[in-house]
Amino acid sequence: MKNNNRLKINLPGFELKNPIMPASGCFGFGKEFSELYDLSRLGAIIIKAATKNEKFGNPTPRVAETSSGMLNAIGLQNPGVDHIINHELKELEKYDVPIIANVAGDDIDDYVYVAKRISQAKNVVALELNISCPNVKNGGIQFGTDCNVAYNLTKKVKKVSSKPVYVKLSPNVSDIVGMAKAIEEAKADGLSLINTLIGMALDPKSGKPILANKTGGLSGPAIKPVAIRMIYQVSQAVNIPIIGMGGISNVQDVIDFISAGASAVAIGTANFINPYICVEIIDQLESKLDELNVNHIWDLKGRSYR
């Protein structure tokens, strides 16, 4: 039986027409992709990170290809939250698609400022806190590697945000479940995982790091097994929804992430290889459900442990 709502997903604060969205940092603000297809077809868009002030990013080279993936050390280059609200978000108002705003900062005050400002934008339905940023006031340690720091950050942002808050977890921790539980305790509305793994690539001739920053975030198919494992663990430990990401490049990957416990997924690096990847997967999802003999995509959620 044909059911037009087979892909619809309800998350705290908003509804998705399908569970597919581009991940932050791999889609910019959608401008280039809007020339290829109607952005309203997407479940949502997670826009590029917003910071309090304009950031010019790290020195080049900032990207390096690796086996089954890529490294990036972009450095959160963006025009600043005020510009994003007044220009990029305004431009996205013409599309019927929920916007999730990725929020970053050098310290807790920065996060609070950006979250308060950008949550007021009318087409922003939720925030995604990028807690993989280095805490400048705490020796550069990532917010997302200390449960207490992540708890406090989440709690403070929740107080000022008028929209649901999702926290993007770093995989570069020894206890991802402990981190997820701390963030749930701070009243986060949801989680997104995983962010990139820290990696390095060397120039074969000089033997020196290719990236000017030396290390970068590893993404792409190489990290999918890590993402699946972490989502499998976290989804059984918390009662808030997960947006899954990390190495998705085809429709079967989407099924795997939802089977592991994700409620929706975000596609990152694959957009660089095939800019149509999100809509192609959306087009293939219903056939995949037929193949698996299930009526609604939600029926697959968490089947790996049910």
UniProtKB/Swiss-Prot annotation:
- Active site, per annotation: C133
EC numbers? 1.3.1.14
Top-level taxon: Bacteria
Keywords from UniProt, A to Z, are: Cytoplasm, Flavoprotein, FMN, NAD, Oxidoreductase, Pyrimidine biosynthesis
Alphabetized Gene3D superfamilies for the sequence:
Aldolase class I (3.20.20.70)
- Pfam families, per database record: DHO_dh
**GO MF entries:** dihydroorotate dehydrogenase (NAD+) activity
- Pathway in which the depicted protein is active: Pyrimidine metabolism; UMP biosynthesis via de novo pathway; orotate from (S)-dihydroorotate (NAD(+) route): step 1/1
Please give the chief subcellular localization of this protein: cytoplasm
* PANTHER family in UniProt: DIHYDROOROTATE DEHYDROGENASE (FUMARATE), DIHYDROOROTATE DEHYDROGENASE (QUINONE), MITOCHONDRIAL-RELATED
**Subunit composition?**
Heterotetramer of 2 PyrK and 2 PyrD type B subunits.
Q: Note the NCBIfam families from the entry.
A: PRK07259.1, pyrD_sub1_fam
Name of this chain's protein: Dihydroorotate dehydrogenase B (NAD(+)), catalytic subunit
Annotated gene: pyrD
